[in-house]
Amino acid sequence: MTSPSPRIQIISTDSAVASPQRIQIVTDQQTGQKIQIVTAVDASGSSKQQFILTSPDGAGTGKVILASPETSSAKQLIFTTSDNLVPGRIQIVTDSASVERLLGKADVQRPQVVEYCVVCGDKASGRHYGAVSCEGCKGFFKRSVRKNLTYSCRSSQDCIINKHHRNRCQFCRLKKCLEMGMKMESVQSERKPFDVQREKPSNCAASTEKIYIRKDLRSPLIATPTFVADKDGARQTGLLDPGMLVNIQQPLIREDGTVLLAADSKAETSQGALGTLANVVTSLANLSESLNNGDASEMQPEDQSASEITRAFDTLAKALNTTDSASPPSLADGIDASGGGSIHVISRDQSTPIIEVEGPLLSDTHVTFKLTMPSPMPEYLNVHYICESASRLLFLSMHWARSIPAFQALGQDCNTSLVRACWNELFTLGLAQCAQVMSLSTILAAIVNHLQNSIQEDKLSGDRIKQVMEHIWKLQEFCNSMAKLDIDGYEYAYLKAIVLFSPDHPGLTGTSQIEKFQEKAQMELQDYVQKTYSEDTYRLARILVRLPALRLMSSNITEELFFTGLIGNVSIDSIIPYILKMETAEYNGQITGASL
């Protein structure tokens, strides 16, 4: 019996054997037969080799004797069975490689080919997403792409990625995955795991469309959105949904197709870990939501919850690069003038102290306001990226407010009340100041077209569409007007101070003191404008007249447009106290003690 291209051929068998047995080499493809491993002994009995003996019906046992080879390319196997004492002889002729394989020596003597991960150098498990990689890098790349995660590098974006240090910098690890040939589209084309959607209150829209924007990279104002229906996505609720993608990629594109966002090295120093803010906000939001719901069945043990909060605050503290200062000073202690004017109590009655600032309310350090966008930047900007960018701007704004000595002097309770009342105005001023960095016009244009398509599919009520469209129009109009005025960094800083120290918000205490700080901010802004723009007589009036427009914008819609995709139904107001408590001595101690 022969095969078309046999590696082993049976030349002859002894005809005296009535029911001859057969020697069979079993490969991975041969299954379904009962096999028995037996020992073959040569004629002298000095050596033994194992073979597989089987009969057509899988029954019977036998003894296999390995005889001396008659030629250099042949070996003899002599076997007997329990019901037949006459030995049968099978001569197997093969090449030397097959002989070694038959004797079980090939796998031992021949070195195995081992492939190594092109990303970290660990032992590879195969080719994944277009590159030979290990299970660790395969899983990391898959998670990063599927969850649209964004990372930041604390160094100069050239960290060493190897088996032992691959977890130290996620930014550089993802960057190397892309450089070594891993393809994002290979992950996105896989079948995604079944995800049970939680029921959430309806917000503004329920859509799974993806928005692709074809545009001149140098001109974000002429974007032309194109809608592509995502048939596989589950319906989501909210003005922005996870299936929505916006292409606002920057001109910095590598030859290998990797899209990166150029970051200012100095800004990266002060905002090195801001890429983790989305995770911090999510952790705090989920914890706050669990506490508010009182769901004991899903709550973790108390010590684990405390540990989660500790890690979240520690991450946030590192991200904002807080200094090793002591706890916020009391009114009587005074504040060092390095961050602005020194604070002194000039008079005190039985109720509240009166505070006066010696020197300027703001220093040159308060003028710097550099927002570092997440990177690497995806080709099609998704909701997670928009929310992450917005969270960076929000936290940067609050960090700026906390750095003002006069603000610190008001105390924690007053700080929380002020920020809760004006966070939307501070955030909007930040949007106007960073509109070019964020490509704000492109994002808003995409949202508008997304909402228009929602109207056609009856996903939103007419009243709700009108409210949201009016809000977006007001936001765009405000940003455009500030761009026309060409507001500089000093003017933006003083405008934010005027907004921050607004005494007319309901529920505030110590309004007279807050009003004093606001008046000082207005006077310093006036002095600056008169000295810097002396030829523009009405510049100050044109700037101040823009502030009332901030009060016309709904904080609820701002929250839904920029943050709902990140924190769900948890309000920004509930997160503000966590952020403002970071400067206590407890969390300053954690900054140096814990590692990210």
Curated annotation (Swiss-Prot):
UniProt zinc finger (NR C4-type) residues: 117-137, 153-177
Covalent cross-link Glycyl lysine isopeptide (Lys-Gly) (interchain with G-Cter in SUMO2) as placed by the record, residue numbers: K192
Domain NR LBD: 341-583
Mutant lacking the gene: phenotype: Impaired spermatogenesis. Mutant animals have smaller cerebellums with disruption of lobes VI-VII. They exhibit a delay in monolayer maturation of dysmorphic calbindin 28K-positive Purkinje cells 7 days after birth. Deficiencies in acoustic startle response, prepulse startle inhibition, and social interactions were observed. Also responses to novel environmental situations are inhibited. NR2C1 and NR2C2 double knockout results in embryonic lethality around 7.5 dpc and increased apoptosis.
Outcome recorded upon mutating S68A: Enhanced transcriptional activation; Greatly enhanced transcriptional activation
Pfam families: Hormone_recep (PF00104), zf-C4 (PF00105)
Outcome of substituting S15A: Enhanced transcriptional activation; Greatly enhanced transcriptional activation
N6-acetyllysine sites (modified residues): K231
Record's subunit section: Homodimer; can bind DNA as homodimer. Heterodimer; binds DNA as a heterodimer with NR2C1 required for chromatin remodeling and for binding to promoter regions such as globin DR1 repeats. Interacts with NR2C2AP; the interaction represses selective NR2C2-mediated transcriptional activity. Interacts with PCAF; the interaction preferentially occurs on the non-phosphorylated form and induces NR2C2-mediated transactivation activity and does not require the ligand-binding domain. Interacts (MAPK-mediated phosphorylated form) with NRIP1; the interaction promotes repression of NR2C2-mediated activity.
Protein name in UniProt: Nuclear receptor subfamily 2 group C member 2
Organism: Mus musculus
